[in-house]
Amino acid sequence: MVEELLSLLHALLDRHQALCMENHQLLKQLRLLVCERARLLRQVCPPSCPVPYPSRFSGESGRLPEFIMQTMSYMLANEEHFCNDAMKVAFLISLLSGEAEEWVMPYIESNSYVLGDYQAFVDEMKQYFGWGTDDEDDGDDDEEEEMEEDH
């Protein structure tokens, strides 16, 4: 019985040694493959962003819709860099200048909650700088009222 157990133990030790050697060879191959992959990746040029970098916004209300669309498109095309609302708001702030830059300073100084809430930040911008379609909607209402008065 003891001899059978010793024989079984030797067989297990031999198998263990063979598996360790195989594991060592596989790790060696893996290291070579990782190095080869890194070498090949260095040769590949990353694709350029299909969406141009947005222009700065200085506070012209007529440009706000264009600015928001440009920044949204850019963030969608580069979403790996804009993983949360705070990153999106920080990106918008980095593109502000002039009156718009002055407007955002109190939010930054008071560490306002809108700095971490993209939609709230955009809503604040719309409220302060105006949104181009609001003026157009008012004009349409006036035209409808004039048409009703004529009939």
Swiss-Prot record:
Acidic residues biased stretches: 133-151
Keyword presence, Transferase: no
Localization per Swiss-Prot or TrEMBL: Nucleus
Subunit annotation: Interacts with NOD2.
BP term (GO), one: cellular response to lipopolysaccharide
UniProt entry keywords in alphabetical sequence: Nucleus
GO cellular component: nucleolus; nucleoplasm
Similarity-based family: Belongs to the LDOC1 family.
Name this polypeptide is given: Protein LDOC1
Function: May have an important role in the development and/or progression of some cancers.
Chain segments carrying region Disordered: 132-151
A Pfam family: DUF4939
